[in-house]
Regions:
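Juxtamembrane inter-helical linkers in multi-pass membrane proteins
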Residues: 42-53, 145-171
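N-terminal signal-anchor transmembrane alpha helix
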Residues: 3-39
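Interfacial helix-start motif at the membrane-water boundary
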Residues: 51-79
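Alpha-helical transmembrane segments of helical membrane proteins, especially in multi-pass transport
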Residues: 120-148
Length: 204
């Protein structure tokens, strides 16, 4: 039951991510210069938030630690966003970001993406997708919202005016029931985070 709910949210979030990815790719094809400017501003914002250039890191161990910490923080943020059932919106931004990174690579790094690049991007995106979908599935059961656009839209229309919507009456039972699934999910996410940091540092 928990797996089914998580997969349903993962599929919904994936559609938002893929849609934004494809639309952004089309816009890059139409307006490459404007989209490159947008990517440059996004990169500046990420650096202001704490991301560092490779040149700023003294050793590969420093690079591994930095990538792991930044990605772990991002994954936690996406999990928290999923708890308030805003993951489809967030995954749209993920699709936009990775489309900019992928399709503007010839301008940004001087070459098109190779197999390793696509594997890295796919692994990073899947980690965020899984984190947001797992928490959304838990929150969906907690607040009585299924992974359908009609129910999500109905929830969004009524939730903006409330800091935290009221959960269903048996929320304690739901929380206990989700504890094993959330624990397993945390282990899987930790493994993915370590793999991504290792691959980006040592795998190229």
């Amino acid at each position: 039951m928990k797996l089914k709910a998580t997969l349903q949210w993962l599929w919904l979030n994936l559609k938002f991510l893929a849609g934004a990815f494809c639309l952004t790719g089309f816009l890059i094809w139409l307006f490459p210069s404007a989209m490159l400017d947008l990517y440059a501003k996004w990169a500046t914002l990420m650096q202001a938030a704490g991301a560092k250039n490779i040149a700023e890191l003294a050793t590969q161990a420093d690079m591994f630690e930095h990538i792991l910490s930044i990605n772990a923080l991002t994954t936690i943020i996406f999990f928290a966003i999923g708890l308030v059932l805003q993951s489809p919106i967030t995954m749209s931004f993920v699709g936009i970001f990775y489309a900019l990174v992928s399709f503007l690579a010839p301008f940004a790094i001087g070459r098109s993406f190779g197999v390793n690049d696509w594997l890295l991007v796919g692994s990073e995106a899947f980690t965020l997708l899984l984190s947001a979908s797992l928490s959304s599935a838990f929150a969906g059961e907690l607040f009585g919202v299924r992974a359908t656009m009609s129910e999500i839209w109905a929830y969004w229309k009524t939730s903006w005016s409330k800091f935290m919507p009221k959960p269903v009456e048996n929320w304690k039972t739901i929380l206990r029931g989700w504890t094993p699934a959330l624990s397993i999910g945390a282990i899987i996410l930790a493994g993915l985070l370590i793999f991504v940091a290792w691959f980006e540092t040592y795998g190229y």
